[in-house]
């Protein structure tokens, strides 16, 4: 077994070690600079870091438990797929910005492009119950930032997150190193919410999906603050689009401040309760943003010219309108869906039964129409907006 394989085995054993203190191990790694350097420290030093006896034993070369070895074997089997990656703290693919944080994870599970994972990232987060204003701006901001060479990082949640991912995916084109990164609050072998299965796959195929949680981990509420910390840790800054006063997005913004990241906030209508968190952030010193160029300027990137009509989405209009009132850049499938919805409201299964397209194609087409504000979905029933 090579030294790299031994290092990976040790990392997996430490990761799955029962009774271990993950924050203590992360801080020790941050202080020592590598797992290899941590292995060379004395037991006394390891104890001062707060490492458990079982962690100290593993670092001293003692064998891992049968349970830890079995879980490590499961990870290695998962990583046999060429698109699956186990990225340890010592790996050359471990994101440098994340390595610089106070509590970097020992291990990342990654699906997709390692180049995307290591690219310049800007986090876009916000309400799961976003208004049309929030969804449209999330899509527009993400699309324009991605076109300028910025990878968009978000959390795969409903609302703002999903629309940010879609905007980046639609802008990425042929540049495989710039797209979007989805950070999960579950194991990477689970999709949460389940409705985003098609979006998850599209991100894995064209960007990167990342998790610090073990395979099989369910969507427990206490996982999501850790996910939010990872989102901000991967990014140079965090843009908050619609957030209530008590919102997980504000937790992400707080982590960003602690990690010395820039915080940006999109203002909203005063009557919109989902925008109050953004207004509070602006009061506290977050940069008010109403144009992607505001962020590009702060990042030292070349500002993009004002969006041309028909070139991309904007908060107020989606391309050149033709006589039907539809954007002229709709796909044929989307036109068929709108044509049917003009005659009757439909459930998703109705479109499937009509054999118009595959599940994934329908899901993406309808989600894109929702983002554009052309259809709405309530209780699973689609209608013309």
For each feature predicted by the language model, list its residue ranges.
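Short, small/acidic-rich helices and loops at N termini and domain boundaries
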Residues: 1-93, 372-381, 385
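Glycine-biased, small-residue-rich flexible motifs in mid-sequence functional cores and linkers
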Residues: 1-6, 80, 86-385
């Amino acid at each position: 077994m090579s030294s790299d394989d031994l290092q990976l085995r040790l990392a997996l054993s430490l990761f799955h070690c029962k009774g271990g203190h993950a924050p203590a191990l992360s801080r020790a790694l941050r202080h020592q600079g590598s797992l290899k350097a941590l292995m060379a420290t004395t037991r006394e030093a390891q104890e001062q870091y707060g490492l458990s006896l079982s962690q100290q034993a593993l670092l001293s070369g003692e064998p891992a438990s049968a349970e830890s070895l079995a879980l490590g074997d499961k990870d290695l089997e998962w990583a046999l797929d060429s698109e699956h990656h186990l990225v340890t703290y010592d790996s050359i693919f471990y994101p440098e910005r994340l390595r610089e944080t106070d509590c970097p994870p020992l291990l990342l599970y990654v699906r997709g492009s390692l180049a995307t994972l290591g690219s310049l990232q800007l986090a876009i987060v916000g309400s799961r119950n976003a208004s049309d204003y929030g969804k449209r701006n999330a899509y527009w901001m993400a699309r324009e930032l991605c076109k300028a060479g910025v990878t968009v990082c978000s959390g795969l949640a409903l609302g703002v997150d999903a629309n940010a991912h879609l905007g980046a995916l639609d802008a990425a084109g042929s540049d495989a190193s710039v797209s979007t990164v989805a950070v999960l609050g579950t194991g990477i072998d689970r999709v949460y919410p389940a409705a985003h299965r098609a979006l998850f796959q599209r991100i894995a195929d064209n960007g990167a999906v990342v998790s610090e949680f073990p395979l099989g981990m369910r969507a427990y509420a206490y996982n999501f603050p850790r996910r939010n910390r990872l989102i901000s840790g991967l990014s140079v800054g965090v843009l908050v689009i619609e957030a209530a006063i008590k919102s997980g997005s504000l937790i992400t913004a707080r982590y960003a401040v602690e990690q010395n990241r820039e915080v940006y906030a999109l203002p909203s209508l005063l009557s919109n309760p989902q925008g109050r968190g953004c207004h509070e952030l602006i009061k506290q010193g977050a940069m008010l943003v109403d144009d992607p160029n505001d962020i590009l300027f702060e990042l030292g990137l070349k500002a993009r010219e004002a969006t041309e009509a028909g070139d991309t989405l904007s908060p107020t209009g989606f391309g050149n309108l033709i006589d039907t009132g539809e954007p002229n850049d709709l796909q044929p499938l989307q036109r068929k869906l709108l044509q049917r919805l003009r005659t009757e409201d439909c459930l998703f299964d109705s479109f499937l039964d009509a054999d118009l397209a595959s599940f994934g194609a329908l899901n993406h087409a309808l989600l894109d129409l929702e983002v554009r504000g052309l259809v709405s979905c309530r209780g699973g029933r689609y209608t013309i907006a």
